[in-house]
Amino acid sequence: MKNTALVINTVFKNCDLWELFFGQLDKHFSKDIKRYVFVDQDDEKIPSDCEVVLYDKTKKYQEQFSSCIGSVSEEYCIYISEDYILYDDVRMDLIENYKNILDKNKNISFIRFIRGGVVDMGLPVYRYYENLYELSNRLPYFYTNQAALW
């Protein structure tokens, strides 16, 4: 998939999940997408096909992420964390459709892969796209650490 990267955010203290996480990722996610791992410490448990981008663990999350994202050259990022264990194949056709929606709707900056948040706010369906809902940036919990395309 052109111009798309997989950004995996993790921390070394969670390395006990990596074997399961990367094993399931290899089974269920396209190998045609470049993989970046944002982490505070490199380790041999991180597969060699991933580009490791180190951050300073003494910084706040926002600063950690900001210091790493500049290493990603692709136009689109699929964001996940190491605790997002895949149990089925990722529908790359949906991701391609979502990229097209982002291309056509410049007022959208990201699409979450989970409808949710802390409360159901009765959000409207976004411009006739099935299963997409508009989320105002004025609502609480506008930013959440969820799997997303941006």
Task: Identify the residue ranges that each predicted region occupies.
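Histidine-centered beta-alpha loop that forms part of the nucleotide-sugar donor binding/catalytic region
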Residues: 11, 81-82, 115-116
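Short catalytic/ligand-binding loop motif for oxyanion handling, primarily in non-cytosolic enzymes
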Residues: 15-17, 43-47, 86-89, 94, ...
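Short beta-strand-to-loop acidic/aromatic patch adjacent to the donor-nucleotide binding site
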Residues: 75-87
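Conserved donor-nucleotide/metal-binding helix-loop-beta segment in metal-dependent transferases, i.e.
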Residues: 88-119
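A recurrent flexible, glycine/aromatic-enriched loop bordering the glycosyltransferase active site
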Residues: 133-150
